[in-house]
Swiss-Prot record:
One of its GO terms (biological process) is protein transport. This is Membrane protein insertase YidC. One of its GO terms (cellular component) is plasma membrane. One of its GO terms (molecular function) is membrane insertase activity. InterPro entries: Membr_insert_YidC, Membr_insert_YidC_N, YidC/ALB3/OXA1/COX18, YidC/Oxa/ALB_C, YidC_ALB_C, YidC_periplasmic_sf. Required for the insertion and/or proper folding and/or complex formation of integral membrane proteins into the membrane. Involved in integration of membrane proteins that insert both dependently and independently of the Sec translocase complex, as well as at least some lipoproteins. Aids folding of multispanning membrane proteins. It is a multi-pass membrane protein. It holds the Pfam family YidC_periplas. The chain crosses the membrane at residues 5-25, 333-353, 362-382, 427-447, 473-493, 520-540. Interacts with the Sec translocase complex via SecD. Specifically interacts with transmembrane segments of nascent integral membrane proteins during membrane integration. It comes from Chlorobium phaeobacteroides (strain DSM 266 / SMG 266 / 2430).
C-alpha cells in the first residue's frame, strides 16, 4: 500500500474507535424535558417521607373496590404464557416459550409481578388519583387456565361496577399463534367525571433484563413513542436522575424495551398525547420506565370506548414490521440517513432470504461476506492494481522527490503528471475500505441488537450476538476489555497478512510501524463487538487475501506503468537546416 492508503486506513481505524466511544451510552444525547401537561404526571409522584394514607381513603367513590379476593387467570398459546389478575385487570406475567434468558432459563418479562404492568390512570373531579391496579375487578370468564393453538381465540373480560351509574370494563383477546393481544377499554358514566376528560393507559415498569451482561443491556433499554411521524426516545442512562417526556398529538404507539424484547401499546383510534418516564438504578443497572398513551373521554356521551393492541414479544424486525405501525423504529440501526438503510434494505432482507435455505447463521455470515466481496470485486480489483502500479512507480517518484526537494510546487506538478500518465489514483487503495464503512457500521447495529443471532452459535462462539470470549479476566484492560475473543485475533492476523502481501509504496519506518499498528487497532476495536461482526470481517479479509494472491500471480510486466521522468515543460528542439 502507498503512504496515502495507509494514512487513510489509519484514519478509518481512528474513526472506528472514536465512533465506538461516541456511541457509548455515556455520550449519547440525553432527552430530558419538562412535561407540558401535569395533571396525571405529577399525580403519580409521591412526596418522600410523607405518611401513606390507607388506600380506601384516597379513592373516593372507588373505595369499596379497594378490597377483595384476587383471581389469577393464565392463557397459554404457541408463543407465550400470560397471567392476568382480577386485581387491576392487569398483566402480571409474560413468559415467552421460544426465548430463554442468558442462562437458558424461562423468565417473566414483567418487572413488577406483585402489582402488574398494565393499568388505567386518571384523576377524578374530587381530586382522587385512581390507578386501576389498586381496584378489584370481577372476572366474567371462569377459566383459570386456557390453552390455545393455531387460529383459536379466547377472550377474558373484567368488570368493575363503581356505582350503579359508573362502570369500567376491560377485555383481553388472545389468539393461538400471535404475540399480539387485543385490549379494549369501556368507561360508562364517566362523562365530565375526570379531570381534563382524559385518562392514561400505561405500561408501568421496565422489562426484566434477560442477558448476563446487565450493564450492556442497560445501554439498549429505553422508552419511546412514534408521534406525529417521528420517533420520540427517552433514555434514562444516568443514575439518580429522573427523565420525563410529555407531548400532545397523534401517536401510533408507546413502548418500552430491553435489549431484545419490547412491550408496546398500540391505539386503534386517536390519542391526545404521550407520557414517558424513566429512572436508572445504579446498583443493578436496571432502567425502570413508564410508557403511557393519553386518551380522551367524551364530555357528553355516557359511554367511551377505546381499542388497543398490545405487543409483548421479541424485537424481531420482520415480526414488528408486520404490525404495520412503524414499531420497528424502536430498533436502533444507527444513523437514519446512512446505516439504517443498509440494515433495513440490504443486511436483514439478505439474512432472512438466506435463512430459508441455511439454518446456521455462521454460514449465512460467511456467504454474505462472499457476496459482498463479489459485489465489490471490480472496485477492489481496480484499486489493488492501482496500488501495484504505485509500488512500481516508487523509484521514479523518489528520483523526482530528490530532484525537486527544494521546489514543492514543481514536485506536486510532476507527481500529478506521472500519476496521470500511469493511470493511478494515490488514494485508490483505501476507497474500497471507505465504501465498506457504512455497511460495517450497519452490521454492528444489526448484530448488536437483532434477536436473529441471539443464542445462535458457530464453531467455538456460543452466541454470535456477543463477543466470542474464551477467557474472562475478571477485570477490564483499558481499550481491550475484560476477556479474550478469538475472531478479532484471527481477523487482526488476516489484516497483517493482507498488508504484507499487498504492494507497498513506501518502505520507511513509518510504514513498518503502521503494518503492526493497524491490525492492533482493529483487534482492540473488535474485541468487544459481536462475534458475528468479527466473523464477517475475518472472512471478508480471507477472501481479500485470496484475491491479492491471485493479482500478484497474474500481474505481468506489461501491466506496469512506463512513465517519462522528463518534466512536462521539456520539449525536443525542432530540427532545422544546418548553417
Amino acid at each position: 500500500m502507498d503512504r496515502n492508503s495507509v494514512t487513510g486506513l489509519a484514519l478509518i481505524a481512528m474513526i472506528m474507535i472514536v465512533w465506538l466511544q461516541f456511541m457509548s451510552p455515556e455520550n449519547k444525547p440525553k432527552l430530558r424535558t419538562e412535561p407540558v401537561k401535569k395533571e396525571l404526571a405529577t399525580s403519580a409522584a409521591v412526596t418522600p417521607g410523607a405518611p401513606a394514607a390507607p388506600v380506601g381513603d384516597n379513592l373516593g367513590i372507588f373505595a369499596t373496590a379497594s378490597a377483595g379476593a384476587e383471581q389469577l387467570q393464565t392463557v397459554e398459546n404457541d408463543l407465550f404464557k400470560v397471567t392476568l389478575s382480577s386485581k387491576g385487570a392487569t398483566i402480571k406475567s409474560v413468559v415467552l416459550k421460544q426465548h430463554l434468558d442468558g442462562h437458558l432459563k424461562q423468565f417473566n418479562l414483567v418487572s413488577t409481578p406483585d402489582k402488574g404492568a398494565l393499568s388505567l390512570l386518571f384523576l377524578s373531579n374530587d381530586g382522587k388519583k385512581i390507578d386501576t391496579r389498586d381496584l378489584y375487578f370481577r372476572s366474567v370468564s371462569l377459566d383459570t387456565l386456557k390453552t390455545l393453538s393455531g387460529t383459536e381465540r379466547y377472550v377474558i373480560r373484567y368488570v368493575l361496577d363503581v356505582t350503579p351509574e359508573k362502570a369500567i370494563a376491560i377485555t383481553y383477546g388472545f389468539s393461538g399463534n400471535s404475540y399480539r393481544i387485543d385490549y379494549d377499554v369501556k368507561l360508562t358514566g364517566f362523562n365530565n367525571a375526570l379531570v381534563g376528560n382524559e385518562y392514561q393507559v400505561q405500561w408501568d415498569g421496565g422489562l426484566v433484563y434477560s442477558e448476563k451482561n446487565r450493564e450492556d443491556e442497560s445501554h439498549n433499554a429505553l422508552a419511546g413513542s412514534y408521534l406525529g411521524g417521528s420517533f420520540v426516545k427517552l433514555d434514562a442512562s444516568k443514575d439518580k436522575e429522573s427523565y420525563r417526556e410529555e407531548q400532545s398529538g397523534l401517536a401510533k404507539w408507546v413502548a418500552l424495551r430491553n435489549k431484545y424484547f419490547v412491550a408496546a401499546i398500540i391505539p386503534r383510534g386517536a390519542t391526545e398525547g404521550i407520557f414517558l418516564e424513566g429512572r436508572k438504578t445504579a446498583a443493578t443497572h436496571f432502567e425502570d420506565y413508564l410508557a403511557a398513551l393519553k386518551m380522551s373521554v367524551s364530555a357528553t356521551e355516557p359511554v367511551s370506548s377505546n381499542s388497543y393492541s398490545l405487543y409483548v414479544g421479541p424485537l424481531d424486525y420482520n415480526t414488528v414490521k408486520s404490525l404495520g405501525v412503524d414499531l420497528e423504529k424502536i430498533m436502533d440501526f444507527g444513523w437514519d440517513w446512512l446505516t439504517r438503510p443498509f440494515a433495513e434494505y440490504i443486511i436483514l432482507p439478505a439474512f432472512t432470504w438466506m435463512n430459508r435455505f441455511v439454518s446456521n447463521y455462521g454460514l449465512i455470515i460467511i456467504i454474505f461476506a462472499l457476496l459482498i466481496k463479489l459485489v465489490t470485486y471490480p472496485l477492489s480489483m481496480a484499486s489493488t492494481k492501482s496500488m501495484k502500479k504505485m509500488s512500481a512507480l516508487q523509484p521514479a517518484l523518489k528520483e523526482l522527490q530528490e530532484k525537486y526537494k527544494d521546489n514543492p510546487a514543481k514536485l506536486q506538478s510532476e507527481l500529478g503528471r506521472i500519476y496521470k500518465e500511469a493511470g493511478v489514483n494515490p488514494l485508490g487503495g483505501c476507497l474500497p475500505v471507505v465504501l465498506q464503512m457504512p455497511l460495517l457500521f450497519a452490521m454492528f447495529y444489526v448484530f448488536r441488537s437483532s434477536i436473529q443471532l441471539r443464542h445462535h452459535g458457530f464453531l467455538w462462539a456460543k452466541d454470535l450476538s456477543v463477543p466470542d470470549s474464551i477467557l474472562d479476566f475478571g477485570f477490564a484492560i483499558p481499550m481491550y476489555g475484560d476477556h479474550i475473543a478469538v475472531f478479532p485475533i484471527l481477523m487482526a492476523i488476516t489484516v497483517f497478512v493482507q498488508q504484507k502481501i499487498t504492494p507497498t509504496a513506501q518502505s520507511n519506518e513509518q510504514m513498518k510501524i503502521m503494518m503492526y499498528m493497524f491490525p492492533a487497532m482493529m483487534l482492540l476495536f473488535f474485541n468487544n463487538l459481536p462475534a458475528g461482526l468479527g466473523l464477517y470481517y475475518l472472512m471478508f479479509n480471507i477472501f481479500s487475501v485470496a484475491q491479492q494472491f491471485y493479482i500478484n500471480a497474474t500481474t505481468t510486466a506489461d501491466d506496469m506503468p512506463n512513465v517519462n521522468l522528463g518534466t512536462s515543460s521539456s520539449k525536443k528542439k525542432k530540427a532545422g537546416p544546418k548553417k
